[in-house]
Amino acid sequence: MASELKEYLVIIPDLPDVLAKRQVLLKPHNQDAAPLVKAGRVPFFGSTLAHHSAEGQQVAENGTVMIIKAESEEEIKEIIRKDIFTIEGVWDFGRLSIWPFKSK
């Protein structure tokens, strides 16, 4: 029997100076993540920013925040390890933060 899924707040910063690489890899990253999103395992996600940009300026993304429903923190680490953003050196896996979370 599978364990009950629990919610976790996941924050993973980008490595320095990878904004251009992030933009190139965004489409394959989103395609790979789509099954988890469609299954309701990732009900919320977005980019963290270095600062808010003025209208028309490039958005200064510097990481990702998401809610992941998983059996364990180890399962989340495995999901993040296999993501193209980790494999191709966008996310700083060593600075991954996983927090137990409860949506309200």
UniProtKB/Swiss-Prot annotation:
Q: Any recorded use in biotech or industry, and what is it?
A: Fusaric acid is phytotoxic to plants such as cotton and banana. It has been shown to induce programmed cell death in plants. In addition to a mild toxicity to animals, fusaric acid exhibits acanthamoebicidal, antioomycete, and antimycobacterial activities.
Pathway(s) of this molecule: Mycotoxin biosynthesis
Q: Which Pfam families match?
A: YCII
What the entry lists under InterPro entries is as follows: Dimeric_a/b-barrel (IPR011008), Sec-metab_biosynth-assoc (IPR051807), YCII (IPR005545)
Induction or repression: Expression is positively regulated by the secondary metabolism regulator LAE1.
Q: Which domain of life is it from?
A: Eukaryota
Q: What happens when the gene is disrupted?
A: Does not alter fusaric acid production.
Q: What family classification does the UniProt entry report for this protein?
A: Belongs to the YciI family.
> What does it do?
Part of the gene cluster that mediates the biosynthesis of fusaric acid, a mycotoxin with low to moderate toxicity to animals and humans, but with high phytotoxic properties. L-aspartate is suggested as fusaric acid amino acid precursor that is activated and further processed to O-acetyl-L-homoserine by cluster enzymes aspartate kinase FUB3 and homoserine O-acetyltransferase FUB5, as well as enzymes of the primary metabolism.
Question: What is this protein called in UniProt?
Answer: Fusaric acid biosynthesis protein 2
Task: Please name the gene that encodes this protein.
Answer: FUB2
